[in-house]
Regions:
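Short N-terminal edge-element motif at the start of the domain
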Residues: 1-39, 47
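Short loop/turn segments immediately following the C-termini of beta-strands
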Residues: 2-5, 48-50, 61, 93, ...
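Structural signal for beta-propeller blades
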Residues: 6-9, 51-56, 106-108
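Short loop/turn segments immediately following beta-strands, especially the blade-tip
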Residues: 11-18, 58-69, 109-120
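A short beta-strand motif characteristic of beta-propeller blades
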Residues: 17-26, 69-80, 116-123
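Repeated scaffold domains used in trafficking and secretory/extracellular systems
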Residues: 28-36, 76-93, 122-136, 164-191
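Conserved loop/turn motif of beta-propeller repeat scaffolds
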Residues: 40, 94-95
Length: 191
């Protein structure tokens, strides 16, 4: 997702030839973060729509490795007043749940049905990234523009700091089984 250009792009990727040029584009205002749902074969993304509010979108991926496309764009949730949808990431330990950070709060989506439900979890503004794991919640709250020198928990307690760093996202190093299989198959190019 490219927020400045408002696009979600697909690329042809080859493990031998590396990255090629983008092949297809979906316009989506201030597109931020995408998450693959391997169980349903959906791609989720946040964007800003008319009126400046944040919405959650769902796409299908056509599976074409030589000309990949996102299809069936569906807006599945629209906030009444929330703006600035930013991070979107699976909730560790809770099936069918996604974190979403926005301008004024952190939310949790339940996507187990076609019409997701949304719950405000933390009334903390401007969180740039969130994830959770066995060791708790990890957030990035910027101290300069869009970065910080460290990471905090949901109480604002510092968990990690590196002087001079410009950290944009923080993640626990744990398996993301919402998006990826337990075992990855290595596929070489087919030329």
């Amino acid at each position: 997702a490219e927020s400045k250009s408002g696009e979600i792009n697909t690329f042809v990727v080859d493990t031998v030839k590396v990255l090629r040029a983008k092949v297809n584009t979906v316009k989506l205002g201030n597109a931020h973060n995408v998450v693959w749902d391997k169980k349903r074969s959906y791609l989720y993304a946040t964007a800003t729509i008319t009126g400046g509010v944040t919405a959650l979108f769902r796409f299908k991926y056509d599976g074409n490795r030589s000309n990949p496309k996102l299809t069936n764009q569906t807006r599945i949730y629209t906030f009444d007043k929330e703006s600035g949808g930013h991070d979107l990431f699976p909730v560790y330990g809770e099936e069918d749940k996604l974190w979403l950070t926005a301008a004024s709060a952190v939310y949790k989506f339940d996507i187990s049905t076609d019409v997701p439900t949304c719950e405000k979890v933390y009334s903390i503004a401007d969180i740039k990234s969130i994830c959770n794991g066995p060791d708790g919640i990890l957030m990035l709250k910027p101290t300069e523009e869009w970065w910080a020198e460290g990471l905090v928990n949901e109480k604002g307690e510092e968990l990690f700091k590196m002087d001079g760093a410009k950290i944009y996202k923080g993640r626990w190093m744990i398996d993301n089984l919402f998006s990826y299989p337990e075992k990855h198959d290595f596929v070489l190019g087919e030329d």
